[in-house]
Amino acid sequence: MIMAKPLSSRRAAPLAGSAPVPGDKSISHRALMLGALAVGESVVTGLLEGDDVLRTAACMRALGAEVERRDDGSWRLFGRGVGGLMEPADVLDMGNSGTGARLLMGLVATHPFTCFFTGDGSLRSRPMRRVIDPLSRMGARFVSRDGGRLPLAVTGTAQPTPITYELPVASAQVKSAIMLAGLNTAGETTVIEREATRDHTELMLRNFGATVRVEDAEGGGRAITVVGFPELTGRPVVVPADPSSAAFPVVAALLVEGSEIRLPNVGTNPLRTGLYQTLLEMGADIRFDHPRDQAGEPVADLVVRSSRLKGVDVPAERAPSMIDEYPILAVAAAFAEGTTRMRGLGELRVKESDRLAAMARGLAACGVAVEEEKDALIVHGTGRIPDGDATVTTHFDHRIAMSFLVMGMASARPVAVDDSEAIDTSFPAFVELMNGLGAKISGDNP
């Protein structure tokens, strides 16, 4: 039986210092997968060594690639070339990683062998039909639990069919799964997205040598086309700090009076920075120093000072660029003066937990006035410090856990989370980093 790891967060003194945020989770997954498909050696530095990404590394080994961590902390991959993956001898256990599972399903769907996927209880409850449907149209066969849930078996096709597929919901994971399947497919595979989603797959594929076209789609949006059978060439990849992980110390510094922190080398891809745009609209003092390009991705050093925030209306169309950041935005909204309305959040219902419900319940327990709607969260801030004094159920969701630990840093009384184990999936050093800046997070009872 897995033992829970409760944590408590107490009101902090002003936060100060510089802290390295871990590598971007989305880019880390993709670097391992494309390095495994490339011809020759790829060296990845800055890889996120959280559980989700380590599961992907283990899966790429199981599929025949050479993957090793070097003494200097970098990762070396020697790939098998497009179409060269091998049938794994065992089940691919994705743990809690929805990104890893969906992208790998695309990767193996156009290889002529069978793979078995499983995951933890949370992942086994998440919908996979959105990936299964387009990959089936390309020729892959699936056997799954009801609703397309894990565990499932994928039998790839030896003669995949290129498709043009319009995403029914904005999803970078589904888009990327189809593009990865398209690499080992003759001709051109096209994904149409009406709302732009994070484009790390497109950027990294080009960086490895694939032909990827991004054009305006008829009727609006973008058409992304990948040309099959490219010769991907091994190359160095530098993974920037994850803007989704940086969100937690950023919001903490905004809320704890007198704080000033610096976060170096944070990814600033415009399709990932919706939270930062929203915080600036709320009155946040965030500076983006030394903007630069790093292996095809924009990065900057973030300087954050404590700020008085005001409530705002967050447009629904911003959701794809900040879908993982709504929990921590809701915490910021709880300290703001005025009402913050967040809409277009239906996708939060099928994340690691029902994040919409989890945030509403947690905020209410901390004394915050909040309304939960079908696809919206409305937080009524008063400009006063929330009471806190609650233990929040995380539902084994790393972002729920970290969000409420940040809340405890600025609330009148401590906030505890019932289990912090899931934090290791994306931010293993979270407690150490936050306490190093001045937080008071511990395993003691509040």
Curated annotation (Swiss-Prot):
List where in the cell it is found.
Answer: Cytoplasm
What ranges does the record give for the region Disordered, renumbered to this chain?
Answer: 1-20
Q: Can you name a GO cellular component term?
A: cytoplasm
> Is-annotated flag, keyword Disulfide bond?
no
Keywords linked to the UniProt accession: Amino-acid biosynthesis, Aromatic amino acid biosynthesis, Cytoplasm, Transferase
Q: Which Pfam families match?
A: EPSP_synthase
The pathway to which it is assigned is: Metabolic intermediate biosynthesis; chorismate biosynthesis; chorismate from D-erythrose 4-phosphate and phosphoenolpyruvate: step 6/7
Listed binding positions for 3-phosphoshikimate are 25-26, 30, 171, 173, 324, 351
- Would I find Cytoplasm among this entry's keywords? yes
The record's EC number reads 2.5.1.19
Q: Any idea which positions bind phosphoenolpyruvate?
A: 25, 98, 126, 173, 355, 399
Q: Which reaction does it catalyse?
A: 3-phosphoshikimate + phosphoenolpyruvate = 5-O-(1-carboxyvinyl)-3-phosphoshikimate + phosphate
Active-site residues, as the UniProt record annotates them? 324 (proton acceptor)
- Which GO terms of the molecular function aspect are on file? 3-phosphoshikimate 1-carboxyvinyltransferase activity
Main localization, broad class: cytoplasm
The processes (GO biological process) annotated in the record are: amino acid biosynthetic process; aromatic amino acid family biosynthetic process; chorismate biosynthetic process
- Please give the function described in this protein's UniProt entry: Catalyzes the transfer of the enolpyruvyl moiety of phosphoenolpyruvate (PEP) to the 5-hydroxyl of shikimate-3-phosphate (S3P) to produce enolpyruvyl shikimate-3-phosphate and inorganic phosphate.
Oligomer status and interactors: Monomer.
Protein family: Belongs to the EPSP synthase family.
The protein depicted here goes by the name 3-phosphoshikimate 1-carboxyvinyltransferase
What is the protein's species of origin?
Paramagnetospirillum magneticum (strain ATCC 700264 / AMB-1)
Designated gene of the protein: aroA
